[in-house]
């Protein structure tokens, strides 16, 4: 009997740097590449039309690239546990390959499939290629616990073995001795479905701002590297109005779906840096996006409650308000704050927003204004954001809501001043909120302050054509900062440790978040609504009080707390999330 192999695509939707697929092909007589439409995407999450379209485009591109190798993609609907026993028998499978999935749900699913494969006499190949590092080795190096500060994480990876270079792309030469059995009715049986076939109404759906697939990902990577003039002097580009728009060099959705190998990106950045800097060693900060990604993957891999507040050993238990009406206004871009509403409109229309825009809307929903749980915001991002990833999405929301990682609860984004500083003319607002197009720049971020005559000229009456602000930002943010302060002081007293949480004497110093203060942001009061400060809590691993704390319900931080120095400005202003550092993706 010949060697009949199957490679199961999940993430990792590419032919370049795919070690599991490459090894699966070696020595095989037949190869079938399958994608099962269910596990995470169609099953457990509410996924919006833009994300589905991106996935289907990825699958279409993968199928097109496999066709060039006289192969095809087999798209199969169902649950993996039901599908594979049938395929093992029907195709006489002897070998199955998969890319390692570090997320708890994925590990549980894969363990079940490996058990079924073993029972059927099928060899299973698992290789790491969605992350740069073996996350278990990072945790082992840290005494069995995931590092919960980025600085500690950097220290650990600096001790790791050098990264392996990407494996060669699957080409006709690689696959030449391996055939794919195909039938005339392949498209009917195994073709990539359309959005309509999946039940989506596509009337009025605009063209994709982010086309899915490996081909597009590699094109963008080359463009991305070409415009990296910042590498020469290693300076970050300054944020401006254009930064808020989708870039033809953006990479985050492609890394999330594995259309682009993170290792390829890493080594391309390294090569470019060495070329410009004459072979000097690149700093870790060059890889900002990739390393923050690894940081959150590492924190989440052994924590099935990572996306929940309750029962999550690294998350502070905060008594958030339940307010479905306010949540809906935020999610649908009806807050009455043009900056927030424009961001949420862009997210719903295009499936992507700039990382600092993510900071603004996350702060507004949680600790800044509405005091609604980060879990609710995370679910909205999971539905709408192309690059939403279970580990990174949950980690970002915990961080931005001051529920875990770095706590900086005095730092609050002003929903008027932050946007005005970024885009003084208001072009971004006019693009996504055309109802406000007629307002002059002076009032476009706070149109409720415009005299009635100006509102009439703009053909937009506040409270009629566009909503009034749903909250008083100055009052809400001041109240919420006090709430957060009390939570951390209570936690600090309970733990018998001091808490560093005070407004610095120099409000315009460079240690503040984005360097903003109440005094230098128009539209923000100086009484705390945008004040800078430090609420940093550093973690010391190996705390024996974890179980006791969980039972007490005060906190489920899971690690010791100690007052510490502020992070460096580089660390302090890192953007967290699927798009995680300014110089890395756009």
Swiss-Prot record:
A motif (LIR 12) lies at residues 486-491. A motif (LIR 1) lies at residues 50-54. InterPro entries: Crypto/Photolyase_FAD-like_sf (IPR036134), Crypto/Photolyase_N_sf (IPR036155), Cryptochr/Photolyase_FAD-bd (IPR005101), Cryptochrome/DNA_photolyase_1 (IPR002081), DNA_photolyase_N (IPR006050), Rossmann-like_a/b/a_fold (IPR014729). It is found in: Cytoplasm; Nucleus. A motif (LIR 11) lies at residues 430-435. Residues 3-132 form the Photolyase/cryptochrome alpha/beta domain. Its cofactor is FAD; (6R)-5,10-methylene-5,6,7,8-tetrahydrofolate. Phosphorylation on Ser-247 by MAPK is important for the inhibition of CLOCK-BMAL1-mediated transcriptional activity. Phosphorylation by CSNK1E requires interaction with PER1 or PER2. Phosphorylation at Ser-71 and Ser-280 by AMPK decreases protein stability. Phosphorylation at Ser-568 exhibits a robust circadian rhythm with a peak at CT8, increases protein stability, prevents SCF(FBXL3)-mediated degradation and is antagonized by interaction with PRKDC. A motif (LIR 10) lies at residues 411-416. A motif (LIR 2) lies at residues 82-87. The LIR motifs (LC3-interacting region) 3 and 5 are required for its interaction with MAP1LC3B and for its autophagy-mediated degradation. This is Cryptochrome-1. It comes from Homo sapiens. The lineage of its organism: Eukaryota, Metazoa, Chordata, Craniata, Vertebrata.
């Amino acid at each position: 009997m010949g060697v009949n192999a199957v490679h199961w695509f999940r993430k990792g939707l590419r032919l370049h740097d795919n070690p599991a697929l490459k090894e699966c092909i070696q020595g095989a007589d037949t190869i079938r590449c399958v994608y099962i439409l269910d596990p995470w995407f169609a099953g457990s999450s509410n996924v919006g039309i833009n994300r589905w379209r991106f996935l289907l485009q990825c699958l279409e591109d993968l199928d097109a690239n496999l066709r060039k190798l006289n192969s095809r993609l087999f798209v199969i609907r169902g649950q993996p546990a039901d599908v594979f026993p049938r395929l093992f028998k029907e195709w006489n499978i002897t070998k199955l390959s998969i890319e390692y999935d570090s997320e708890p749900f994925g590990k549980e699913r894969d363990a079940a499939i490996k058990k079924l494969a073993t029972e059927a006499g099928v060899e299973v190949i698992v290789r790491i290629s969605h992350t740069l590092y073996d996350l278990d080795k990072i945790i082992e190096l840290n005494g069995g616990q995931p590092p919960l500060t980025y600085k500690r994480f950097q220290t650990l990876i600096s001790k790791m073995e050098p990264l392996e270079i990407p494996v060669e792309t699957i080409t006709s030469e690689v696959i030449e001795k391996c055939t794919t059995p195909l039938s005339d009715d392949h498209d009917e049986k195994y073709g990539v479905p359309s959005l309509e076939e999946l039940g989506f109404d596509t009337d009025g759906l605009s063209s994709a701002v982010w086309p899915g697939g490996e081909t597009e990902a590699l094109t963008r990577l080359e463009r991305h590297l070409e415009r990296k003039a910042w590498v020469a002097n290693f300076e970050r580009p300054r944020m401006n109005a254009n930064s808020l728009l989708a870039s033809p060099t953006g990479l985050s959705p492609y890394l999330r779906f594995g259309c682009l190998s993170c290792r390829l990106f890493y080594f391309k950045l390294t090569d470019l840096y060495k070329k410009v800097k004459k072979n000097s060693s690149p700093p870790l900060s060059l890889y900002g996006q990739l390393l923050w990604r690894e940081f959150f993957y590492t924190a989440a891999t052994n924590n099935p409650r990572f996306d929940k507040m309750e029962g999550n050993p690294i998350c502070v238990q905060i008594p958030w308000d339940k307010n479905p009406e306010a949540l809906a206004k935020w999610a649908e871009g009806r807050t009455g704050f043009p900056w927030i509403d424009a961001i949420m409109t862009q997210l719903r229309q295009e499936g992507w927003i700039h990382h600092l825009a993510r900071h603004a809307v996350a702060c507004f929903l949680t600790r800044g204004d509405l005091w609604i749980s980060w879990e609710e915001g995370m679910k909205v991002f999971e539905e709408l954001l192309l690059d939403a990833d279970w580990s990174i999405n949950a980690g970002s929301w915990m961080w931005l809501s001051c529920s875990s990682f770095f706590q900086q609860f005095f730092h609050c984004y002003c929903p008027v001043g932050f946007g005005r500083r970024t885009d003084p003319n208001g072009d971004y607002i006019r693009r996504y909120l055309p109802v406000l197009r007629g307002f002059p720049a002076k009032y476009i971020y706070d149109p409720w302050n415009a005299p009635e005559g100006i509102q009439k000229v703009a053909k937009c009456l506040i409270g009629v054509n566009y909503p009034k602000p749903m909250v008083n930002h100055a009052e809400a943010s001041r109240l919420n900062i006090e709430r957060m302060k009390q939570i951390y002081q209570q936690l600090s007293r309970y733990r018998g440790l001091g808490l560093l949480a005070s407004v610095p004497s120099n409000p315009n110093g460079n240690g503040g978040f984005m360097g903003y203060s109440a005094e230098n942001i128009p539209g923000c009061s100086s009484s705390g609504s945008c004040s800078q400060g430090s609420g940093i809590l550093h973690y010391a691993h190996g705390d024996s009080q974890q179980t006791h704390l969980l039972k007490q319900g005060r906190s489920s931080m899971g690690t010791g707390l100690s007052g510490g120095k502020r992070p460096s400005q580089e660390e302090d202003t890192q953007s967290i999330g699927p798009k995680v550092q300014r110089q890395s993706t756009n």
